[in-house]
């Protein structure tokens, strides 16, 4: 009885009360999805966007029992993004049966893909946000930071915190990502790593591919070069990319041998 009454009362709460900040960029379909997600995950409030990239926006959300989530909303945008989506999803064995129709369906695949990739990272013990829920074009994950204030990106970390220890910790996460989760990030840089309590968190894995993907080695090489370039630029002694690759179990058609003999 009391439970039923309480539930009715909760439904009576005006939907607008869910949103701390009015965001006119949220379309009505996404808005309704956010309301459904709030009911499902016991979310009390969504806060203003902490980031608006080209293809996604991130909002902090607070549950009634005081947990913070990061809510990533993917947007249907340009033809370029459609091409990128196709490039990464085609060739990925997990998506070979998916018949691609509309850009909206693509964006939903994109959200599910990031969810699955985060789940693989989490299972393999890689430091990354834990996935919580995915619905349509919206992904809910663990919030990296405190009280709705996000952790800094590697790009934003103060100079004195950019150390060899941090570099090694990041390379260790990349190794776990490849050897245990069998994933290559594909867009790794100082913009897609957060640092919290001196610990790196790998984020933005929607485009990450299985190590069997035809471009996996090429992407991994570029990821490592980005990390090395960043730390070298801050005076940290880095390990040559080919040495790191030597420890990574990524032997596809193109293979490590080809890389090693040319490098
Ligand atoms: P952008 O183009 O802005 O990089 P994106 O589509 O690449 O957007 P992400 O990189 O996943 O999306 O997230 C955008 C930003 O949101 C990140 O740079 C980071 O500041 C913040 N962010 C992402 N995930 C989380 C999280 N789990 N917890 C806290 N903040 C996060
Ligand atoms: Mn990003």
Language model features by range: what are they?
Residues 1-8, 24:
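N-terminal targeting/trafficking signals and adjacent low-complexity tails
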Residues 8-19:
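A short, surface-exposed helix-loop junction/capping segment
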Residues 21-150:
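Conserved ATP-binding subdomain of kinase catalytic cores across diverse folds
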Residues 33, 37, 157, 230, ...:
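Residues that form generic nucleotide/phosphate-binding pockets
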Residues 75, 145, 190, 195, ...:
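Short, glycine/acidic-enriched loop or turn micro-motifs at the edges of active sites
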Residues 95-101, 148-159, 203-210:
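Short glycine/proline- and charge-enriched loop/turn segments
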Residues 102-130, 134-135, 150-186, 191, ...:
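Conserved kinase catalytic-core helix
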Residues 165-166, 179-185, 196-263:
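C-lobe/activation-segment region of protein kinase-like
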């Amino acid at each position: 009885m009391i439970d039923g009454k309480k539930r009715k009362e909760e439904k009576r709460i005006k939907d607008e009360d869910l949103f701390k900040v009015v965001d006119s960029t949220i379309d009505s379909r996404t808005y309704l999805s956010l309301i459904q997600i709030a009911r499902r995950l016991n979310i009390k409030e969504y806060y203003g966007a902490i980031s608006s990239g080209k293809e996604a926006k991130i909002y902090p959300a607070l549950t009634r029992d005081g947990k913070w989530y990061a809510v990533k909303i993917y947007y249907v945008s340009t033809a370029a993004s459609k091409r990128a989506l196709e490039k990464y999803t085609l060739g990925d064995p997990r998506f070979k049966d998916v018949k691609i129709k509309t850009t909206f369906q693509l964006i939903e695949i994109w959200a599910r893909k990031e969810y699955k990739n985060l789940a693989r990272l989490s299972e393999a013990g890689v430091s990354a946000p834990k996935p919580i829920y995915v619905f349509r074009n919206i992904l809910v994950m663990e919030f990296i930071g405190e009280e709705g204030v996000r952790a800094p990106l590697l790009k934003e970390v103060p100079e004195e915190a950019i150390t060899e220890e941090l570099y090694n910790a990041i390379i260790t996460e990349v190794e776990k990502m490849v050897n245990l989760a069998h994933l290559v990030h594909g867009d790794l840089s100082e913009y897609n790593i957060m640092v919290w309590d001196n610990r790196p968190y790998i984020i933005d894995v929607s485009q990450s591919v299985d190590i069997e993907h035809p471009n996996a080695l090429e992407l991994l090489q570029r990821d490592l070069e980005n990390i090395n370039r960043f730390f070298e630029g801050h005076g940290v002694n880095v390990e040559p990319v080919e040495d790191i690759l030597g420890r990574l179990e990524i032997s596809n058609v193109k293979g490590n041998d080809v890389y090693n003999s040319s490098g």
